[in-house]
Amino acid sequence: KSGKFLDGEINIRIGESVRGCDCYIIQPTCPPTNDNLMELLLMVSAFRRASAKRITAVIPYYGYKLEVGGQSMQRSKNKESTAAIASADIAQMLVTMGVDRIVSVDLQPPGQGEIEGFFANSAPVDCIEATYAGVEYFRPIVSKDAVIVSANPTCTKKTRDFQSGLLGSGYR
């Protein structure tokens, strides 16, 4: 159970024994990003303290991933900056709190693929590609005259993959 104390701090309570269990926490870190992230970290901690055998964090939206491959990441690689790399810091926080595995959707920004490396060998990362699930969902309901447009240039490949999936699935 997740709630808040009167002062706004997050309060996590586990309502049953999870000792020796495989536990799955489903929590996106979308806006309000920081609140959702803190809730996730505290849930992982609560399950770990309750002696869960394994904790898998299912994070449909992994917040702070947009900086990966961007300006701050490039500066950090060149050691020209001391800026934080939030994606790496969040990965470290999750592992420190006790997560054993991460499952996310479209984890890396298109064309990047670097976030999984932030977890090193400490927590395996599974990335589910939404494109293929989207094809299965939209194929029966999208008109053959539909126009598929990319939100921005970095998403062009995903858009083409989605279109190809529809065309390859009998979409005409």
Per-region residue spans from a language model:
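PRPP-associated nucleotide enzymes
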Residues: 1-172
